[in-house]
Amino acid sequence: MAFGLIGRVVGTKSSRLSTAARLIPARWTSTGSEAQSKASTGGGGASLKTFQIYRWNPDNPGKPELQDYKIDLKDCGPMVLDALIKIKNEMDPSLTFRRSCREGICGSCAMNIDGCNGLACLTKIESGSKETTITPLPHMFVIKDLVVDMTNFYNQYKSIEPWLKRKNPASVPGKEILQSKKDRAKLDGMYECILCACCSTSCPSYWWNPESYLGPAALLHANRWISDSRDEYTKERLEAIDDEFKLYRCHTILNCARACPKGLNPGKQITHIKQLQKSG
């Protein structure tokens, strides 16, 4: 798939976030050595698994590296997030990553696992001796280790004004604006988005135009409000994104659909917006 580890850019113009534009081959470090040594000599039916994890510290801004950690899968939960938590708690407290709900709801633990974007809490650890490589979301500025800067992503989401807009307020202030079951069903496949950024950071068009192309996530939410029967700014919303870069950088590669942990298809929603632009 096109959103693997090749050609990743994890640098930034800011000196605080400065990183190299390539990954360094994994090498052993002394951090957590005691716990790793204990695991590697676990004997008695231990099922050892090596995790290669991207490390970069802004307080020591050299080249990033992949660091090896070995854990016993028999003493670990089944998900990649379980392994990360075990490593942080028992081997290396300096390892930094985002996580919260552990249920695929918050989207915090989005990262690149063995070349594919996904949520660590929903990705099962593959059995076998092959190493599992964990890196930050592709083509995002790295803050530290697996934590990326989501500022631009959230600003793009904010730019599509993701809230109900009315020209005619409800007759009774505070009264709910109703819609039919049929109109409500039109929002399926869009409202479930958790803004994890797996789709946008898997998109080659977004890699090369992150400042101008809104990306799959923001455009999916744009269509969510364009399709909402209660919203009265459909024309204005369409005009706001009728732009060569904001909308039409999408070339229907559909990496976004393959990467989405919720099974959504942003490419389909973007196509719907393009069709409305033509018919409008």
From Swiss-Prot:
It catalyses: a quinone + succinate = fumarate + a quinol. It is found in: Mitochondrion inner membrane. Binds 1 [2Fe-2S] cluster. Its main location: mitochondrion. [3Fe-4S] cluster binds at residues 203, 250, 256. The keyword RNA-binding does not apply. Pathway: Carbohydrate metabolism; tricarboxylic acid cycle; fumarate from succinate (eukaryal route): step 1/1. One of its GO terms (cellular component) is plastid. Signal peptide: none annotated. Its EC number is 1.3.5.1. Residues 1-28 form a transit peptide. Keywords: 2Fe-2S, 3Fe-4S, 4Fe-4S, Electron transport, Iron, Iron-sulfur, Membrane, Metal-binding, Mitochondrion, Mitochondrion inner membrane, Oxidoreductase, Transit peptide, Transport, Tricarboxylic acid cycle. It is a peripheral membrane protein. It holds the Pfam family Fer2_3. GO terms for biological process: mitochondrial electron transport, succinate to ubiquinone; tricarboxylic acid cycle. It comes from the Eukaryota. Ubiquitous. Preferentially expressed in flowers, inflorescences and root tips. Residues 51-140 form the 2Fe-2S ferredoxin-type domain. InterPro entries: 2Fe-2S_ferredoxin-like_sf (IPR036010), 2Fe-2S_ferredoxin-type (IPR001041), 2Fe2S_fd_BS (IPR006058), 4Fe4S_Fe-S-bd (IPR017896), 4Fe4S_Fe_S_CS (IPR017900), Beta-grasp_dom_sf (IPR012675), Helical_ferredxn (IPR009051), SDH/FRD_Iron-Sulfur (IPR050573). [4Fe-4S] cluster binds at residues 193, 196, 199, 260. The keyword Metal-binding applies. SUPFAM superfamilies: 2Fe-2S ferredoxin-like (SSF54292), alpha-helical ferredoxin (SSF46548). This is Succinate dehydrogenase [ubiquinone] iron-sulfur subunit 2, mitochondrial. It comes from Arabidopsis thaliana.
